[in-house]
């Protein structure tokens, strides 16, 4: 049982108003940060990436599906894996409901993994997701965006989340954003990794409102409790 200070309604309201002022300050700071994110310079994508999709091979530009903006989630599912990463699966449970709303704002959404397409399709059917999920197998895409690494590099130093660190797996999570101009030229505008993906997990935002919060302090690692939703 949680032990907590108990006060009158009037005292609670006073403290809640004080916290509300901080919450509003945080919201304004987040809005400013989002504006700065949009002002980042872009990098032209020159490499001709090709993906295996249920509709055949498609280029990166073709994944935009008529939109000018593309969100890519880099899902940890490598060649030969029997199932996808539990943490990526936790995050992916939030995708299907958001996609129609993203489409209304000129945004296409696709999940990319390095596993061959039949392996992706098998896991997708098992879980029951509907979002578009394509394979970058045989291309440099995952490696160029620092979410896949040669097996020999696992346990040694590599670049992930814009720093040099020990690589713990040959597949890592991330999200990358792209823009396509009217001429069809594609630009990379943003990528985030690790805790940078935290804001995308709606369930975490709900947990942050509860008395126990995420309740992960005593776990071996923060997401040790996470299970795929069919388990």
What is each stretch, according to the model?
Residues 1-70, 75-105, 122-128, 132, ...:
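Non-globular targeting/processing and membrane-anchoring segments
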Residues 73-74, 109-115, 120, 136:
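Short His-Asn-centered micro-motif
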């Amino acid at each position: 049982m949680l032990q907590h200070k108990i006060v009158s309604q009037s005292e609670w309201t006073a403290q809640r108003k004080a916290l509300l002022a901080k919450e509003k300050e945080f919201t304004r700071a987040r809005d400013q940060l989002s504006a700065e994110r949009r002002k980042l310079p872009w990098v032209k994508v020159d490499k001709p990436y090709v993906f295996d999709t249920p509709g055949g091979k498609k280029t990166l530009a073709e994944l935009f599906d008529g939109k000018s903006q593309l969100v890519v989630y880099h899902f940890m599912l490598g060649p030969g894996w029997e199932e996808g990463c539990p943490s990526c699966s936790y995050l992916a449970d939030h995708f299907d409901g958001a996609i129609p709303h993203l489409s209304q704002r000129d945004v296409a959404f696709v999940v990319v993994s390095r596993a061959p397409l039949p392996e992706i399709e098998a896991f997708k059917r098992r879980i029951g997701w509907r979002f578009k999920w394509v394979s970058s197998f045989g291309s440099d895409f995952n490696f160029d965006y620092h979410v896949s690494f040669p097996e020999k590099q696992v346990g040694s130093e590599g670049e992930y989340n814009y720093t040099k660190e020990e690589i713990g797996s040959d597949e890592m999570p991330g999200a990358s954003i792209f823009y396509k101009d009217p001429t069809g030229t594609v630009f990379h505008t943003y990528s985030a990794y690790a805790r940078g993906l935290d804001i995308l997990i709606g369930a975490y935002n709900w947990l942050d409102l509860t008395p126990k919060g995420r309740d992960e302090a005593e776990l071996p690692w923060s997401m040790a409790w996470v299970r795929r939703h069919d388990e």
